[in-house]
C-alpha cells in the first residue's frame, strides 16, 4: 500500500514538472526545429503542433540572443527586482509590527478588525482595481513603480501569516523577559523577531513568488514600457521568436525556484501554522 502511494505521488510530481521540462527543451532547440514542431501555431494552419522532450541538435542560441541582444530584458529584470524588493521590504516594515500588535495586545474591536483583514485578504485584485486606480491617479502615482509597490506594502496576507507565529510565543517566556526588565519594544526585538522569524520568512517567500510574477497591476497602472517588469516582457515576444520566449521563461523561473527551495522548510511551517484553528 505504501509503495502504491509513493508511486502515485511520483507520477503526479512528474506530471507537475512536465511544463518545466517543456520549457527547458524548447529553450535548447534551434529556430528551424521549433518552426517545424510549432508550424500549425505559427502559420495558423490546420493540424496539431507536436513536441519532443529532447532537442534534436541542442543549442544555446536562444540564451545568447536573450542575454546579449535583448537589452530590454535586463531593464525589465531590474524593474522586477525593484518591485519585488520594494514590496517585501515595505511589508516587513509595516506587516511585522502589525502582526505583533494583533498577537500580543488586546484592544476594542480587535476581532472585528481581524475579520476585516481576512475579508480584504480574500478579495481578488479585480475587486479593488478601480478604487486603487482612482486613488493612485489623485496621488499622481500612475505609471510609476511606486504606484505598484505602495498598495502591495499594505497587503493583509503577510500579517495573517506572521500573526499565527507571534501568537504561539509562550506567555511564560514573555513574563520572564519582563521580569528581566525588558519593555514592550525590547520584547518585540529580542523575543518576537527571533521566535517569529519562521513566520516572517514564510510570508516573504510566498510574497516573492506572488510579486515576482505580478502581471495585473503593471498592466493596469503602467503605460511606459521602460517601467514594465518581466511578467509583461514575455507576453510581448512574437511567435516567430519562440526560442527567445522559452529561454526568457526559464531565466524568469530560476529566481522563483531558488527562493522556493531556500525557504521551503519555513513555507511548510507557515502553511501548518495557518491551518491550525484559533
Where are these regions (language model features)?
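A structural signal for multi-pass alpha-helical bundles of membrane permease subunits
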Residues: 5-278
Amino acid at each position: 500500500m505504501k509503495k502504491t502511494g509513493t508511486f502515485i505521488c511520483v507520477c503526479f510530481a512528474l506530471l507537475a514538472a512536465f511544463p518545466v521540462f517543456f520549457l527547458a527543451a524548447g529553450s535548447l532547440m534551434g529556430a528551424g526545429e521549433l518552426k517545424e514542431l510549432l508550424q500549425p501555431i505559427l502559420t495558423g494552419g490546420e493540424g496539431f503542433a507536436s513536441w519532443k522532450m529532447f532537442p534534436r541538435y541542442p543549442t544555446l542560441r536562444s540564451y545568447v540572443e536573450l542575454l546579449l541582444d535583448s537589452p530590454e530584458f535586463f531593464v525589465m529584470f531590474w524593474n522586477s527586482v525593484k518591485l519585488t524588493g520594494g514590496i517585501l521590504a515595505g511589508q516587513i516594515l509595516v506587516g511585522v509590527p502589525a502582526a505583533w500588535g494583533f498577537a500580543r495586545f488586546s484592544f476594542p474591536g480587535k476581532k472585528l478588525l481581524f475579520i476585516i483583514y481576512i475579508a480584504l485578504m480574500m478579495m481578488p485584485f479585480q475587486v479593488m482595481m478601480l478604487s486603487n486606480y482612482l486613488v493612485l491617479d489623485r496621488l499622481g502615482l500612475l505609471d510609476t513603480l511606486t504606484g505598484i509597490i505602495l498598495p502591495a506594502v499594505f497587503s493583509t496576507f503577510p500579517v495573517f501569516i506572521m500573526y499565527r507565529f507571534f501568537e504561539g510565543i509562550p506567555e511564560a517566556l514573555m513574563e520572564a523577559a519582563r521580569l528581566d526588565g525588558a519593555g514592550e519594544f525590547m520584547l518585540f526585538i529580542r523575543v518576537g523577531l527571533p521566535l517569529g522569524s519562521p513566520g516572517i520568512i514564510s510570508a516573504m517567500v510566498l510574497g516573492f513568488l506572488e510579486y515576482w510574477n505580478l502581471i495585473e497591476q503593471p498592466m493596469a497602472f503602467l503605460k511606459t514600457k521602460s517601467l514594465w517588469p518581466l511578467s509583461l516582457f514575455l507576453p510581448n515576444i512574437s511567435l516567430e521568436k519562440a526560442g527567445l520566449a522559452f529561454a526568457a521563461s526559464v531565466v524568469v523561473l530560476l529566481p522563483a525556484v531558488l527562493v522556493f527551495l531556500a525557504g521551503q522548510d519555513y513555507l511548510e511551517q507557515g502553511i501548518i501554522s495557518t491551518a491550525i484553528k484559533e
